[in-house]
């Protein structure tokens, strides 16, 4: 026979479960469609997973936007499509040419001498429907003039924009977020912009993101894991707060990446671009014939000894507080490149300054980073130790493998990798 205490315990559990089931059943059923224009229901806040193992520094693949894709907003699914249409019967002219070459000059001797370039009207259509594609939530159309403040006017004029990439939904900003890539066709010259549409399809903003290809920072537009902030590569957008600018006077942004939900790594190089004694933007200039899409820019990056002594990297919170400063120089070929790896088992990011040091950044507390000079790291020799995990860092200037003790990330051994084929 069961004791009275056991009986009371079982009865209490039964009543508790019954109450929970009753509360769950009390939610009203979904209402049928009404004659009012449909709007997107409020989305539940995104919840971070308990095991935070994602690499937030990974590069975005920049795939063109979805022609017809099922997306999740809060707890509901919707169908999103993005279309780009070019109208070759509606030319758009602009001068001066700036970064655009003679391949896009207006076919007239006088216009060519004046540096006039020609593109064509484009329409960018964003359509959101319910999950089965029957009800239209919104349909929004944008055009090239909407992007005139996001990139140089001459580049916007001639661009054939790929369908904007869908980056996700930010609950805090109430926005569907898109990455837009605006470039001179058949060249490596272009800019990026971040477009925000609210749940009714209204434009919340188009934020310029700076260069996207040649001379680009190591940065892609991103939403923080919780959706509370959006990185546009020139600023951080936050709900109910002004944008947090990442730009500095007399400095070039070289990298910006989320490290965790509330913290970023931001790297600058201090100095200024100074043009040489040439005439930029002229379509009559040498090496700018009718086949040139983007003439070579003739400039130098000028920096001073005092600027070269300044800390270049910051661990920056999304509130704008600088948590840590140190010197770090990314790789640079046609664009900046953070030579890096995500050591998931140890919960740390590995950043390599070529030929100098390894910077180990704990994801949970990035301000507690530490630096390990490469010359002082012990060389890896077999056998591999019980808690060591290998992580390769390969870039234009670095080919190294680090064996990190996942229980003590300060214990690192290094191995040089053979040259690439």
Label for each model-derived stretch:
Residues 1-9:
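Bacterial N-terminal signal peptides that target proteins for export
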Residues 67, 153-166, 208-222, 249-262, ...:
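Repeated scaffold domains used in trafficking and secretory/extracellular systems
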Residues 145-226, 231, 362-364:
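A charged, solvent-exposed segment within the mature domains of Sec-exported extracytoplasmic proteins
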Residues 29-56:
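Post-signal peptide N-terminal segment of mature Sec-exported envelope proteins
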Residues 127-156, 193-210, 234-250, 275-330, ...:
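Surface-exposed loop/turn elements that mediate protein-protein interactions on large endomembrane-trafficking
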Residues 61, 70-118, 173-186, 219-233, ...:
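Short beta-strand elements that form the blades of beta-propeller/WD-repeat-like
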Residues 8-18:
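Bacterial N-terminal signal peptides
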Residues 20-24:
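Bacterial signal peptide processing site
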């Amino acid at each position: 026979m069961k004791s009275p205490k056991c009986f009371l315990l079982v009865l209490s559990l039964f009543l508790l479960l019954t109450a929970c089931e009753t509360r769950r059943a009390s939610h009203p059923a979904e209402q049928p469609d009404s004659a009012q224009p449909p709007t997107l229901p409020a989305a539940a806040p995104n919840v971070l997973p308990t095991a935070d193992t994602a690499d937030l520094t990974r590069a975005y693949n920049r795939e063109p936007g979805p022609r017809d894709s099922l997306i999740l907003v809060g707890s509901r699914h919707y169908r999103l499509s993005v279309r780009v249409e070019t109208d070759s019967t509606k030319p758009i002219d602009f001068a001066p040419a700036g970064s655009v070459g003679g391949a896009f000059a207006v076919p007239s001797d006088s216009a060519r001498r004046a540096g006039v370039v020609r593109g064509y009207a484009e329409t960018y259509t964003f359509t959101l429907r319910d999950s089965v594609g029957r009800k239209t939530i919104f349909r929004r159309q944008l055009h090239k003039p909407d992007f005139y403040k996001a990139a140089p006017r001459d580049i916007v004029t001639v661009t054939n924009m790929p369908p904007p990439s869908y980056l996700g939904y930010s609950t805090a900003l109430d926005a569907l977020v898109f990455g837009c890539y605006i470039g001179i066709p058949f060249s490596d010259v272009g800019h990026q912009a971040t477009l925000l549409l609210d749940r009714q399809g209204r434009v919340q903003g188009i934020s310029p993101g700076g260069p996207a290809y040649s001379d680009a920072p190591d940065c892609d537009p991103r939403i923080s894991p919780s959706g509370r902030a959006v990185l546009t590569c020139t600023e951080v957008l936050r709900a109910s707060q002004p944008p947090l600018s990442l730009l500095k006077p007399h400095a070039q942004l070289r990298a910006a990446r989320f490290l965790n939900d509330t913290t970023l790594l931001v790297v600058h190089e201090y100095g200024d671009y100074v043009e040489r004694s040439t005439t930029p933007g002229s379509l009559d200039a040498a090496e700018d014939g009718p086949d040139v899409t983007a003439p070579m820019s003739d400039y130098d990056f000028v920096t001073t000894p005092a600027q070269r002594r300044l800390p270049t990297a910051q661990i920056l919170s999304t509130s704008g507080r600088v948590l840590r400063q140190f010197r770090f120089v990314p790789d640079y070929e046609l664009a900046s490149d953070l030579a890096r790896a995500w050591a998931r088992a140890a919960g740390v990011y590995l950043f390599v300054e070529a030929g100098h040091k390894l910077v180990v950044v704990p994801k949970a507390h990035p301000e507690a980073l530490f630096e390990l000079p490469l010359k002082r790291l012990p060389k890896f020799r077999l056998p591999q130790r019980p808690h060591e995990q290998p992580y390769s860092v390969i870039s234009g200037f670095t080919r190294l493998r680090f064996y990190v003790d996942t229980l003590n990330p300060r214990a690192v051994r290094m191995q040089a990798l053979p040259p690439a084929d």
